[in-house]
Regions:
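Hydrophobic residues within membrane-embedded alpha-helical segments of Major Facilitator Superfamily
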Residues: 11, 17-18, 24, 48, ...
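Membrane-proximal helix-loop-helix units in multi-pass membrane proteins
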Residues: 67-127
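C-terminal ends of transmembrane helices
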Residues: 51-67, 110-115, 158-167
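Selected alpha-helical membrane-embedding segments in polytopic membrane proteins
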Residues: 2-90
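Membrane-water interface of alpha-helical transmembrane segments
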Residues: 4-8, 12, 93-96, 100, ...
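Hydrophobic core segments of alpha-helical transmembrane domains in multi-pass membrane proteins
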Residues: 38-46, 101-107, 147-156
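Terminal transmembrane helical module of multi-pass membrane proteins
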Residues: 112-169
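Membrane-helix interface and helix-disruption motif detector
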Residues: 30-39, 90-99, 140-148
Length: 169
């Protein structure tokens, strides 16, 4: 029970942002067929970081003071930095690999979160995303890869965030 009230709120916030961008990119790819819409992914940190303090402010009771809360925050901060920087690099040197990398990193961060929380659902969801969704991307048309990211955001961010908030009550 090493949780602050609403400790999962940041995960829910970022999960919703990722889900909305995933659906937007997917719809635009389907409607236009232009892969340039993939650059919208960079809108996640551009929109998310300024909105984050406004949306989450005051909802996390003690600001993540426990070891577990700090560790989980650091896991996801590292994911955000790695995913943003590497996606930026890959967009120019190997754009076809960006989705695989991002989904694999998302799964890895979720697995680490599950291990830290000793939560088998979150751990399993991370493995499904990191391994299953990454492999599945090889079989989907490029236009459908954002749907893997949408599923991953629900499985690895939104649902675990809700679980964490309920566990803290």
């Amino acid at each position: 029970k090493d949780f602050e009230k609403n400790a999962g709120t940041p995960m829910i916030f970022w999960g919703v942002i990722v889900l909305l961008f995933s659906l937007a990119v997917w719809m635009l790819l389907i409607l236009t067929g232009k892969l340039e819409w993939n650059f919208l992914w960079f809108g996640i940190p551009v929109i998310g970081w300024p909105l984050y303090p406004m949306v989450v402010k005051g909802r996390c009771k003690s600001g993540g003071k426990s070891f577990i809360s700090r560790s989980i925050g650091q896991i996801w901060l590292a994911y955000g930095i790695f995913a943003t920087v590497l996606a930026g690099v890959f967009a120019f040197i190997a754009p076809h690999l960006t989705g695989y990398l991002t989904v694999a990193l998302l799964g890895y961060a979720a697995v680490m979160t599950g291990f830290a929380l000793k939560n088998n659902y979150i751990t399993a969801g991370g493995f499904i995303t990191g391994l299953g969704c990454t492999v599945a991307l090889f079989f989907f048309e490029k236009e459908f890869s954002p749907l893997c990211v949408a599923v991953a955001s629900i499985l690895n961010l939104i649902v675990p965030g809700i679980m964490m908030n309920r566990r803290a009550k």
